[in-house]
């Protein structure tokens, strides 16, 4: 997840993060980034991954959503195959996801192998509510990035 935060562009990342293909287009909503105080060990997360039951997001639909600035399609297809494994190791991730969904964010997911979570909404209200449901003492980072 580092390359697209550095470049501020959406990207499809493969391999060990070393193959970066930027996606054309943008989604014009701000992105809330939340990092719990606790973390995850990437090696452990991958060791818990159930490869027989692995789902992958439809990257074609995600790329088209960015190209067309189609928030609803993006919301229906964003996924992270590592989330279930990471939650087994770190329940703070699930708590953060649940709190952000309760605020009304349509897209809530984990970045990379965790424990950072991102949230995006097509409405303004969730961006006002999150401050009430996230205790700053439990998080290293709570930041809004303008858009991707």
Show where each model-derived region lies.
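Glycine-rich beta-strand-to-loop/alpha-helix junction loops that act as flexible
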Residues: 110-115
């Amino acid at each position: 997840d580092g390359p697209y935060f550095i470049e501020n562009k959406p990207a499809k990342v493969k391999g060990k993060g070393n193959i970066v293909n930027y996606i054309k287009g943008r989604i014009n909503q701000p992105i809330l980034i939340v990092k719990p105080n606790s973390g995850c060990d990437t090696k452990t997360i991958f060791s818990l991954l159930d490869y027989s039951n692995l789902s992958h997001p439809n990257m074609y639909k995600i790329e088209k959503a960015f190209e067309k600035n189609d928030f609803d399609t993006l919301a229906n297809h964003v996924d992270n195959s590592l989330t279930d494994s990471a939650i087994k190791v770190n329940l703070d991730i699930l708590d953060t996801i649940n709190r952000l969904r309760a605020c009304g964010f349509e897209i809530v997911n984990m970045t990379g192998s965790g424990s950072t979570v991102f949230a995006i909404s097509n409405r303004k209200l969730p961006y006002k509510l999150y401050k009430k449901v996230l205790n700053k003492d439990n998080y290293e980072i709570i930041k809004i990035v303008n858009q991707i």
